[in-house]
Each structure stands twice: as structure tokens, then as C-alpha cells.
């Protein structure tokens, strides 16, 4: 499949830090490439319709996020964690988390409490560290396909425009913050 692949580079990181917004786009650590779509037991194949560009994605691309974040993410990776997909003709929002159950691990205390966003095993198990969009083993939404477990797929009601539905993940983050 075709995908935009992010590959971190220390020289590019320091160049981007130095040049700031004047950093030439052609030097971004991002390239269009043909990448294989892995097979994973228990994961479904979801065709990507749209994927957002988050501030965290831009921070990576323009050198605002330091390479020290790598213990929580794994690269090179197909970015994109705000994902609107299509499954069997229906639109679905894809939750990008890769918590204990996704990693084939027994639930950690946070996952047992229903706090999967605070999973203590985000860097453990057979999958590389990180969530969809920041994981070298599973591609994010800047590719043609993603893999997700059925529990991570949330149906979008008919009639909701795709350009709005793609904001399901950031909306969920806001609502979660308001409910705390």
C-alpha cells in the first residue's frame, strides 16, 4: 500500500530546530513509499477514508518533539492517529490506542479500571511501543489501510459528513477531559 512514512533523523531534527518555520518542506523526514500491510490475528483491515493532521504530528515533522519521546513510540512509522475508515461499506472512527488487550497482555491496573489511555504496557508485548500512527508495526492513517481490533472501531451515524467525522478522535479527547 502507499503511505507517508516518517523516519526520524537527528541531523534533520537539529536543522528544523534551528530553522523553525523556515524549514523547507522538501527536507521533512516524511516520504511517500510502498509499504506492506501486516497481518495480525484479531485485527481487522480498515480502508482509510480520511486522517487528520494533529499538532503532535506537526511537532514531530518540524522538530518540536525531541527524539527522547522514542521510548513511547516506535519509528519509522506511518503517521496519523485521527482516523476515519470504512468497514463493509460503513464509516467507522478508529480508536488508535494499543493497550494491554491489543498487545495480547493481561490487563494492567489502569486498563482494569477502564483507563486504557493510561495503559502501563504501551511499550510491552509483541507490538512495538506506541499507538496507531506512532508504531512501526501497525500503520497509521496516512496510509491506505490500518489494522484495528473490532473493539477499536466506532460506527459513524449515516448522514455525518466525512469531513466532520474525522474529528471523532480529537472530540473524544475533549469530552474525556470535560468528564474528568
Task: For each feature predicted by the language model, list its residue ranges.
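Charged, amphipathic alpha-helical interaction segments
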Residues: 8, 90, 175-179
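NAD(P)H dinucleotide-binding glycine-rich loop of Rossmann-like/cofactor-binding domains
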Residues: 70, 81, 99-180
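Glycine-rich beta-strand-centered segment in the early N-terminal region that forms part
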Residues: 36-51, 66-113, 152-159
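Short N-terminal strand-loop motif that marks the start
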Residues: 1-79, 144
Amino acid at each position: 500500500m502507499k503511505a507517508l512514512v516518517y523516519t526520524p533523523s537527528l541531523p534533520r531534527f537539529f536543522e528544523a530546530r534551528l530553522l523553525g518555520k523556515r524549514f523547507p518542506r522538501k527536507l521533512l523526514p516524511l516520504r511517500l513509499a510502498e509499504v506492506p500491510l501486516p497481518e495480525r490475528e484479531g485485527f481487522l483491515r480498515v480502508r482509510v477514508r480520511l486522517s487528520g493532521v494533529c499538532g503532535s504530528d506537526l511537532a514531530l515533522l518540524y522538530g518540536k518533539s525531541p527524539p527522547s519521546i522514542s521510548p513511547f513510540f516506535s519509528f519509522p512509522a506511518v503517521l496519523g492517529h485521527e482516523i476515519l475508515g470504512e468497514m463493509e461499506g460503513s464509516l467507522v472512527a478508529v480508536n488508535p490506542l494499543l493497550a494491554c488487550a491489543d498487545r495480547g497482555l493481561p490487563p494492567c491496573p489502569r486498563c482494569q479500571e477502564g483507563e486504557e489511555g493510561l495503559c502501563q504496557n504501551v511499550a510491552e508485548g509483541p507490538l512495538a511501543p506506541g499507538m496507531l500512527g506512532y508504531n512501526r508495526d501497525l500503520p497509521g492513517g496516512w496510509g491506505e489501510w490500518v489494522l484495528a481490533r473490532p473493539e477499536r472501531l466506532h460506527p459513524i451515524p449515516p448522514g455525518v459528513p466525512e469531513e466532520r467525522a474525522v474529528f471523532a478522535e480529537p472530540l473524544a479527547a475533549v469530552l474525556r477531559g470535560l468528564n474528568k
